[in-house]
Design a protein with these regions (language model features):
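Sec-dependent N-terminal signal peptides
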Residues: 1-4
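Cell-envelope/ECM-targeting effectors and their regulatory/trafficking segments
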Residues: 6-452
């Protein structure tokens, strides 16, 4: 068999960025949700100061008295264009993409001074948050019955909800919070983050939850169902469902989590959790190991691709002989790709779709290989999925390279980060929590609602 790498030996790789002004974020065709606590939000703040200093502060990028949103859209693009007329940006090349409102390296340096350029991880985070759309400071999203019309959330006299509970797309999460989509169900990431933050700053967590503090303490210990068993009498599902169907309690939890998203202590716990060996660390190494067995070295685009799949899907398939054979056979057929790494990403996307959100997963995956294929090479299904979801791409919009190798970081074990949540083995529920969740929510319909004619 001809080695896979040899098949690509005569094929030019993805074009390296020109020697001109390199792109950091290009939001000219679609807004980028980088996050209100990201380095890009700090850029917005500094850009507003730069504009104010040269008399071009209106319309504002960041209105007076407000915090930056981290959403890179029209206001930021127009702010960059106006700033090009300021003395502080006189060294930005005249032919720079910045003339269209693109955030480039020369614009960053002019506005941010000695602040380092955004890292590959920070750019990947911005792309992933643009997909997830669950920023710090936002209310959490409930995943119960999420595929149907949920009415007023009131059970009927017979104990069933006043709507049909459809949940095909995300039956095991129950509740989602924060930019990496932390859940209270299968992953228990919400429990981990709150427990870590509570032990570091008890008063902050206790103040946020108020009268729900006792419930929060029970929440840490309640049994979950794992990734496979998401229906029926699962204690943590009973607990969260009872909150979801009780408007005052629901608001208390939503307000608490939204408030805590503004806490530096909580955000640090969140970041440390995901960076740990128990979460991203081992999975990133597993993806890199798969690439190594295929004779590939992960690039910047690969790193973002891995991190996105970890967020939305999980670990890669097991590296058995069948998987490796299928990947190699697929890559050999991808002769229109200008990069073997892009071919591998497309092949993995096809080999390992999402169990319940296949179209969304495909749409996200396409954003990591779209730029490596000529027009007409991808299927109509791929293009429509990408264009109909969040049409961003790692190379075009985030300036990531499919040539530059990416470093897979060493990760610390969770045990090194402090207090570990208690064992989730409790079934302690109040009588109202046991009665408060309709059977139709505990046992949802695992399909999407029929289309309305």
């Amino acid at each position: 068999m001809i080695p896979i790498v040899a098949l690509f030996a005569g094929v030019p790789g993805p074009a390296r960025p020109a020697d001109g002004d390199k792109i950091i974020l290009d939001a000219t065709r679609y807004d980028i949700l980088a996050g209100r606590y990201s380095v890009f939000a700090r850029f917005q703040e500094s850009l507003q100061r730069t504009l104010n200093a040269c008399g071009k502060g209106t319309p504002p990028v960041v209105p007076a008295g407000e915090e930056p949103t981290g959403r890179i859209g029209v206001a930021t693009r127009e702010g960059i264009q106006r700033a090009l007329e300021c003395a502080a940006l006189r060294d930005v090349p005249r032919d720079s993409p910045a003339k269209d409102g693109v955030l480039t390296e020369s614009v960053w340096r002019a506005v941010m001074g000695r602040a380092p350029l955004p890292t590959v991880h920070e750019r990947a985070d911005a792309l992933i948050l643009s997909y997830e759309a669950t920023d710090f400071g936002d209310a959490p999203e409930w995943n119960l019955c999420q595929d149907g019309q949920r009415g007023e959330l009131r059970p009927s006299k017979g104990g069933s909800p006043d709507f049909v509970c459809y949940n095909e797309s995300d039956p095991c999460s129950f509740l989602t919070w924060g930019p990496r989509g932390a859940t209270a169900g299968a992953g228990r990431e919400i429990q981990w983050v709150l427990w870590m933050a509570w032990h570091r700053s008890p008063g902050e967590i206790e103040s946020a939850f108020g009268s729900e503090l006792d419930s929060l303490q029970r929440f840490f210990r309640l049994k979950g169902g794992g990734k496979k068993n998401c229906d029926g009498d699962i204690p943590v599902k009973h607990f969260l469902c009872a909150i979801w169907t009780d408007p005052p309690r629901r608001k208390a939890w939503e307000d608490a989590l939204a408030k805590l998203g503004h806490s530096e202590n909580v955000r640090r716990a969140y970041a440390e959790l995901y960076a740990s060996e128990d979460f991203d660390g081992a999975k990133l190494r597993d993806y890199a190991s798969l690439w190594k067995k295929l004779g590939l070295r992960p690039t910047e685009v690969d790193y973002a691709f891995f991190l996105d799949r970890i967020t939305h899907l999980g670990e890669p398939p097991d590296e058995d002989d069948e998987v490796l054979h299928k990947m190699r056979a697929c890559i050999q057929k991808e002769n229109r790709a200008i990069s073997i790494n892009a071919a591998a990403r497309r092949c993995l996307s096809h080999l390992q779709p999402h169990d319940t959100q296949a179209d969304y997963r495909l749409a996200r995956d396409v954003g990591y290989y779209l730029d490596a294929y000529p027009e007409g090479a991808l299927t109509e299904k791929e293009i429509q999925a990408w264009a109909g979801y969040v049409p961003l791409s790692a190379v075009h919009n985030f300036g990531l390279s499919d040539v530059t190798p990416a470093r897979i970081p060493n990760a610390a074990p969770m045990s090194s980060l402090g207090a570990k949540p208690p064992h989730a083995g409790s079934s302690e529920l109040t009588s109202s929590e046991l009665r408060g969740c309709p059977a139709g929510v505990l046992w949802p319909v695992h399909r999407r609602p029929p289309r309305q004619e």
